[in-house]
From Swiss-Prot:
It is found in: Nucleus. SMART domains: WD40. GO terms for cellular component: nucleolus; nucleus; small-subunit processome. The lineage of its organism: Eukaryota, Fungi, Dikarya, Ascomycota, Taphrinomycotina. Residues 51-64 have a biased composition (Acidic residues). PROSITE patterns: WD_REPEATS_2, WD_REPEATS_REGION. It comes from the Eukaryota. Keywords: Nucleus, Repeat, WD repeat. GO terms for biological process: maturation of SSU-rRNA. The keyword Ribosomal protein does not apply. The keyword Repeat applies. It holds the Pfam family WD40. This is Uncharacterized WD repeat-containing protein C2E1P5.05. Coiled coil: none annotated.
Length: 524
């Protein structure tokens, strides 16, 4: 029998032609038969054709869809989704959705993709607003280093390695909030119930020294802690049991930050390096070098970049992961007038406003606003948390007969910063007993204190802050989480006596849905 490979193509063509001729003859026979046969033939051919179409649709739905048709289909689906969300928020019929409202939502999404969306929350906070406060004490006996939240659960951690899980129990006020639109400042009453806790077991996969920082993954599945033992421990958020332990750092882990919308994590350490991790694959990605001193803080948003502060090297660095480059911003170069006469010795904390702006806090009490397009700060606010009281001569000298000359008062450090991403609201903390809220001006060239009648009062040193937005529409609120204690987060440089170690949660109701404004581009 001959191999089909060696057969001549002419024979194959002839066979194909003969096959087609046979089909034509069969069709002619069917036409000669009655109309019943025609109906049967048409029915069979249509069913075969429809079955063939179903198979194509099941296997490849978008095979025969052009690029323009696909864009049109996706745009219609997106508009329908936005309209449904607006209807749910406003409580009116879809036909009544105004074009301006829909256009503002589309503009908001575009600005969010560009990283230039600025939500105006500060103008929606009534100065006479009623703020509800809850204190998280639980089993914590050491200073807290972090308080984070995901949906209805709150997690707190202290230096001893104790991690406590809380559940929020919300009770609405008796008066109807739908009618007053927060004009008289109604808030949701806060109650938190401890439901689980976990202590460090000092084992191979757990911490063996003090904890310094706390973070939670964006999907709420993992709780991550860093400590003085050079370790990063990943725990299950449900059971609080340690699942993984990374020992890549060569010194104490000082800070953790999650990339927004992903499970990519950045960690900074006293070994002067930043490491990038993936919580999805539970793997190490890369290491970033450049700082000359201990890296005390790191923060990140949606893009593949992060901002870090290097302590006494007095620099802030923007790390561009994809471009494999970094931008260096040097502090301490401003005039003595801008710092109220106090020299800057260390940059201790950082918070990103958007992809192009961030704020830093220093040990001389200065909060600085930076842009990635300029090497110098756009604006500095000196003595943001005031001065410490003057010490008595016997307190600052070891001599039996100290010199009566008084030492000038020293500024309170900025121990923590936090911001709502892509908004004009951020918060700062120290050990003066108050969390201060700040309003960024339009154009992002300055900021000022946000005045409210009821201060956000806490006890002790504010070691960590986090801000989040809760609810939608008329029920929207800004929630502030604070981790406080008798000592600072990474040492006993400042100790306060008679202060409980606890966390605090504040609910600040908003009057209406926040508006969106464009951020002006700042030229160098």
């Amino acid at each position: 029998m001959s191999d089909p490979f060696f057969t001549r193509p002419e024979h194959r063509k002839r066979k194909a032609r003969s096959a087609t001729s046979k089909r034509e003859k069969e069709n002619q026979k069917l036409e000669r038969n009655g109309p019943a046969n025609e109906d049967l033939a048409s029915i069979s051919s249509e069913s075969e054709f429809n079955g063939f179409e179903d198979e194509i649709d099941e296997e490849n739905e978008d095979t025969y869809e052009t690029a323009a048709e696909k864009r049109l289909r996706l745009a219609r689906e997106y508009l329908d989704e936005v309209k449904n969300e607006l209807v749910e928020d406003g409580g009116f019929d879809a036909k009544e959705v105004d074009r301006e409202l829909l256009a503002s939502r589309l503009k908001e999404d575009v600005l969010e993709k560009k990283g230039q969306m600025y939500l105006d929350y500060t103008s929606k906070i009534n100065p006479d607003v009623k703020i509800e406060t809850a204190q998280l004490r639980g089993r914590h006996m050491r200073p807290l280093v972090g308080v984070v939240a995901y949906e209805n659960f709150v997690y707190s951690a202290d230096k001893s390695g104790l991690i406590q899980k809380w559940e929020a129990l919300q009770e609405k006020d008796t008066e109807n909030r739908e009618n007053d639109d927060h004009e008289i400042g109604k808030a949701i009453k806060l109650h938190f119930r401890p439901i689980k806790f976990s202590r460090s077991r000092r084992g191979e996969n757990d911490h063996v020294k003090e904890i310094t920082c706390l973070a939670i993954s964006n999907d709420g599945r993992w709780i991550v802690t860093g400590g003085l033992d050079h370790r990063i421990v990943i725990r299950d958020s449900v059971t609080l049991e340690p699942q993984h332990c990374w020992k890549h750092h060569r010194d104490a882990v000082m800070g953790l930050a999650m990339r927004r919308g992903t499970n990519e994590m950045f960690s900074c350490s006293a070994d002067r390096s930043i490491k990038v991790w993936s919580l999805d694959q539970m793997s190490y990605i890369e290491t970033l070098f450049g700082h000359q001193d201990v890296i005390f803080g790191v923060d990140a948003l949606a893009r593949e970049r992060c901002v870090s502060v290097g302590g006494r090297d007095r620099t802030s660095r923007l790390w561009k992961i994809v471009e494999e480059s970094q931008l260096v911003f040097r502090s301490g170069g401003t005039s003595m007038k801008a710092t109220a006469g106090y020299m800057e010795g260390s940059v201790d904390c950082v918070a990103m406003i958007d992809e192009d702006h961030f704020v830093t806090g220093s040990d001389n009490g200065v909060i600085a606003l930076w842009s990635v397009q300029r090497k110098k700060p756009l604006f500095t606010y000196p003595l943001a948390h005031g001065l410490d009281p003057i010490l008595a001569p016997g307190r600052h000298s070891a001599e039996t007969s100290p010199d009566p000359v008084t030492i000038p008062p020293q500024p309170r450090w900025i121990t923590s910063l936090a911001a709502i991403p892509y908004s004009n609201l951020f918060a700062s903390g120290s050990w003066d007993g108050n969390i201060r809220l700040w309003k960024i001006a339009e154009g992002l060239r300055s900021f000022e204190p946000l005045t409210i009648a009821t201060p956000l009062s806490v006890y002790g040193c504010i070691n960590s802050l986090s801000l989040s937005l809760q609810g939608k529409g008329k029920q929207s609120e800004v929630r502030v989480f604070a981790a406080c204690g008798r000592e600072t987060r990474v040492g006993r440089w400042k100790t306060l006596r008679g202060i409980p170690n606890s966390g605090f949660v504040f609910n600040i109701p908003l009057t209406v849905i926040p508006s969106v404004t464009d951020g002006d581009e700042i030229d160098e």
